[in-house]
């Protein structure tokens, strides 16, 4: 047997749906294309081991395909784990004083799933979960999957117009939320676009602006026109409804859509990336394998998750990965709080910690950081946006996370496609986002020539494999723009790949600055500015300029207590970077515009700077 790199394809049948771009079977690239691209044949022996390094000097790599992918649904995975480790702690929600074993969680999920069906929801209906991290969020994530209902992850910070947009976009039939969190009055926000809810019969809502929405469920307070979540769960507790749920399981497929994750909106209007059981189960399972969770003892499987569950990293690498490996998921607070994360590590003997770079910066900067017992920590995941090398080193050394893994992915890819191995060196973790994940292909394309880029040459990163979404819900044209005929997803990220297969994200193709014909990648300059001893964080954007087209603007956040000047920063650049890369504008800031998941919205930052500079 002989196959070539690029021909190992994973065919998958995706359930047809009115919102998804038809059936998605992964297609093989022709052997002629492979030869034209300089890709050589592999022996069967090579196929059996990990194929994680580029061949022929070109930026293409394929992950290991030795182990089979998992064809179970989320519900089947929960059942397997509950049978294997029934008495192990599954979920701890510190701010709600919730503790459940896997057996208890399975029982509650079954009742909630049965309850959702009992109130008239059906397989394929969309249910929006709108709120901060909570027990109810985890319950709805798993119960919808068990019932065949598609969970719509709604940003908890959304206001009326944003909420209306996403509910209409996917045709939500049900919406679940708490009454209030901090200043966010969820019920009152809904009333702005759905005033009919106040006088509606619970479960029989008829709304002019939201014609698909019939059922509103309140998590924690009786509200006019709504059902209480406890009532829904109680309704599903009868033997009749539980038997019906069991009967319905035979009609669920791992290729059914399970979750609509709206992209973060860092570049414009959010799009509803639609993911299947197959996407989510396998991505979480493969990431756990990369983290070597199968080698850990129960005491070493205690995951602190400060990331929002509405985001793909939280729901897949958090909830689902813990479910797959029998790990304990610990929610420290409703939204990220650095102090609460440290308290959770200390109190719950946490071993793994997730976070974005911004979250880790805040954790490290806690005034009483040294007072917490973090001796049980051993690893974790940092993802969401590029992390400077100095931050990686600080996390490993100060938080005791020697097995830290830098992960890269996109919502459209379920999400993780690149990650380090725990044993990779600090330098490798500081300078790249790791190596390709199993059952995943990556290539970097020369954006001008449309061919495979040579190694160590920037180009647009493309991904193919089981992990690619079913499509953007209700937007076939945007799906076609993102996923080409050969099933490659074009990420929009500019990246390089070295001889060992390590990938480095250079920036967004839309973020690339073109100054007088010179291509400038913000990530390169951001890495450089992080070497300045007074700089805490920096973001580089392009701002409009009549003469040069664009000029460089560095938005710098200084370390606490530090002071410097524009002149000193520019002097620091001279002789170290090319003259055309020295920013024309240096602006000192105290914060950046962020999505709720902690990603920096560069398009908003660019707009702010252009206003600030009167451009």
Swiss-Prot record:
Listed EC numbers: 6.2.1.2
Alphabetical keyword list: Acetylation, ATP-binding, Fatty acid metabolism, Ligase, Lipid metabolism, Mitochondrion, Nucleotide-binding, Transit peptide
Residue span of the annotated presequence: 1-41
GO molecular-function terms, A-Z: ATP binding; long-chain fatty acid-CoA ligase activity; medium-chain fatty acid-CoA ligase activity
Subcellular locations according to the entry: Mitochondrion
Residue positions where N6-acetyllysine is found in the record: 179, 182, 340, 398, 510, 544, 570
Residues that, per the record, bind ATP: 263-271, 493, 508, 599
Segments crossing the lipid bilayer: none
GO BP terms in the entry: acyl-CoA metabolic process; fatty acid metabolic process
N6-succinyllysine PTM sites in chain numbering: 182, 478, 544, 570, 599
Enzyme class: ligase
Catalytic reaction equation(s): a medium-chain fatty acid + ATP + CoA = a medium-chain fatty acyl-CoA + AMP + diphosphate; octanoate + ATP + CoA = octanoyl-CoA + AMP + diphosphate
Entry's Gene Ontology cellular component terms: mitochondrial matrix; mitochondrion
Induction (UniProt): By PPARG.
UniProt record similarity statement: Belongs to the ATP-dependent AMP-binding enzyme family.
Function: Acyl-CoA synthases catalyze the initial reaction in fatty acid metabolism, by forming a thioester with CoA. Has some preference toward medium-chain substrates. Plays a role in adipocyte differentiation.
Name by which UniProt lists this protein: Medium-chain acyl-CoA ligase ACSF2, mitochondrial
Biological source species: Homo sapiens (Human)
Lineage: Eukaryota, Metazoa, Chordata, Craniata, Vertebrata
Gene name linked to the record: ACSF2
